[in-house]
Amino acid sequence: WTRTGNYLFTSEAVDQGYIVLGTETLIVNPQHLGTDGYSSTSILSMNDNGQGLLGIDGIFNGVDMDAGTCGPPASNITCNKTPMFKITDNYGQSWAGDHSAYDFYYVPDEVFEDIFSTWPNTDVDACTGEVSVINDFWSWYEFDMRVDQEGNPHIVISLIAESDNYFHFLDGYTGFYHFTI
């Protein structure tokens, strides 16, 4: 397999014990993502009622993590790394999302800003006394997304405080956060 992107395959039939797969669907187009390597691979969750979620923890096209820049189209969506997902109510025969965000729903900046506003503005290194100004956050690649029996999404991601030079682990603030609707 030499192509990039995330593909969805569905089983069409079983023939003499072999699963016959239908035509592949490019479900996460790499052209819709920012700098390669900063978005996770996709995760899929489906309940018994055919309600499902397919998602990644990633950045939108226009974010260049290496250069530290954010331009369109990401600057019109979000420049942050964020959970991005599509939902289905028919076992993945069709998927829905925000059309203005490459058919992904995503956790908006306002949610992260609300969390960030409760964090301390600085962190003092206990060994050196160096004071770092906390000015951003980061999300590692450890995450999970699931749908419950009512079809509601549940997203768990890591949030780490960031300064100009370091990542900071702040007791009682940084760690795993659970988002749901």
Short names for language-model regions:
Residues 1-181:
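Extracellular, repeat-based ectodomains that mediate carbohydrate processing or recognition
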